[in-house]
Regions:
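Domain-level signal for soluble alpha/beta catalytic cores
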Residues: 1-218
Length: 219
């Protein structure tokens, strides 16, 4: 099968659209934790992936944006994160493989989590338990689940803090080393306002500077 990196040299690849907004449109009743849906509503997610593929997407992203132990803490589901990621990847893979007329790739979605390491480090709150190592460990479990579920690569999505992004990229590298894989990684950032900065106050140039050594497929 063609590596996504090779395909990108030849043509522009089309990513899918929003997952959360589509789930809301379908009116599924659930507790608001999108990342548990691979375990509870796999059929719904498969349908969404297939709808995007039928609309022309070359790449579908797993429904695992917040499937890390830090983000899942509030839902009491931190211990299910590995399973969420395996299931999320398997569902997207099944949808991608059902497309017989062309190749569709699966990217494992890893969001910024609901914590900002830069802000935590500035606040120095003695009650705060999330550190760089805690977040990196959470991303490590997520990345291993995505690899085991069969992704073609990773998308570190809507980065809001360069420190968080480095934690995710470090974890992906460690997971790939352990699993013996060399899957591509892409990164996207969320710009807050006209200043062109991300939430933690970094410019895109500063963010790029902090992640450029990670051999990203795209930024």
């Amino acid at each position: 099968t063609m590596d996504i990196r090779e395909a990108l040299k030849e043509r522009i690849l089309i990513l899918d659209g929003g997952m959360g907004t589509y789930i809301q449109q379908l009116g599924i009743s659930y507790d608001g934790n999108n990342d548990a849906l691979p375990l509870t509503h796999p059929d719904v997610l498969e349908r969404i992936h297939k709808d995007y593929i039928n609309a022309g997407s070359d790449i579908v992203c797993t429904c695992t944006f917040g499937a890390n132990a830090v983000s899942q803490h509030g839902y009491g589901m931190s211990d299910r994160c590995y399973d969420m990621n395996v299931a999320g990847a398997q569902i997207a893979r099944k949808a991608a493989n059902s497309c017989t007329d062309r190749k569709v790739w699966v990217m494992g979605s890893m969001g910024p989590s609901d914590k900002s390491l830069t802000i935590i480090e500035m606040m120095m709150d003695p009650e705060e338990t999330v550190t760089f190592d805690v977040l990196e460990d959470a991303y490590f479990i997520q990345a291993k689940g995505l690899i085991d579920g069969g992704v073609d690569g990773f998308i570190v999505e809507t980065v809001t803090d360069g420190r968080n992004a480095v934690a995710a990229l470090t974890a992906i590298n460690k997971a790939q080393q352990e699993k013996g894989t060399n899957l591509p990684v892409t990164l996207s950032a969320s710009i807050m306002n006209a200043s062109g900065c991300i939430m933690a106050g970094m410019s895109l140039a500063e963010l790029y500077g902090s992640v450029k050594d990670y051999n990203l497929m795209s930024f």
